[in-house]
Amino acid sequence: MGKTADNHGPVRSETAREGRENQVYSPVTGARLVAGCICLTPDKKQVLMITSSAHKKRWIVPKGGVEKDEPNYETTAQRETWEEAGCIGKIVANLGTVEDMRPPKDWNKDIKQFENSRKDSEVAKHPPRTEFHFYELEIENLLDKFPECHKRHRKLYSYTEAKQNLIDAKRPELLEALNRSAIIKDDK
């Protein structure tokens, strides 16, 4: 992924990358590697959220799978933010890694039987489903035409509203990333 003609940010494609055949997984845990952005307004009072492609009434943040040809997580985060939200901006902070510890969709539902069969009380119930690498991005521009503009809605929310959206969407790992950002916490 090169630079735009003005050398500012990644090249912005007109189509979104889809499918998981070129995505990267952790060699240690098998978790899918994902990168995304917490996109804040310059005054840090609002965060940009998008509707989930799987659950249209749930609001989340832009993120997606790391591809084999991407040199780093930051590149993936900016690409996904462009494709899913039409957001252009500057990365201002690395928010670190957050693991999605929700059980995989096909995980054994009878976890009690597994727990009872083990004497080790500290055993992990399952490995992380996803390993997220998040960045804080300062919004410079929101373009109307972007690869997923016909699939998703986007909206700016205050911290309190965004926090509730992520609780409603059952996405504690995304809330963790939001909490690590410099957004003004208006719920205090």
From Swiss-Prot:
* Lineage, uppermost ranks: Eukaryota, Fungi, Dikarya, Ascomycota, Saccharomycotina
Enumerate the spans annotated as Nudix hydrolase domain: 30-179
Example GO biological process term? Answer: diphosphoinositol polyphosphate metabolic process
- Disordered: annotated segments: 1-23
Q: What is its EC number?
A: 3.6.1.52, 3.6.1.60, 3.6.1.10
Which CDD domains does this chain map to?
NUDIX_DIPP2_like_Nudt4 (cd04666)
Q: Which GO terms describe its molecular function?
A: bis(5'-adenosyl)-hexaphosphatase activity; bis(5'-adenosyl)-pentaphosphatase activity; diphosphoinositol-polyphosphate diphosphatase activity; endopolyphosphatase activity; metal ion binding; phosphodiesterase decapping endonuclease activity
Cellular location(s): Cytoplasm; Nucleus
Which residues are 1D-myo-inositol hexakisphosphate-binding? R32, S52, S53, K63, R102, R129, R152, R171
Q: Cite the record's Basic and acidic residues compositional bias ranges.
A: 1-21
How is this protein named in the record? Diphosphoinositol polyphosphate phosphohydrolase DDP1
Is Cell inner membrane given among the entry's keywords? no
Q: Tell me what organism the protein belongs to.
A: Saccharomyces cerevisiae (strain ATCC 204508 / S288c)
The alphabetized UniProt keywords are: Cytoplasm, Hydrolase, Magnesium, Metal-binding, Nucleus
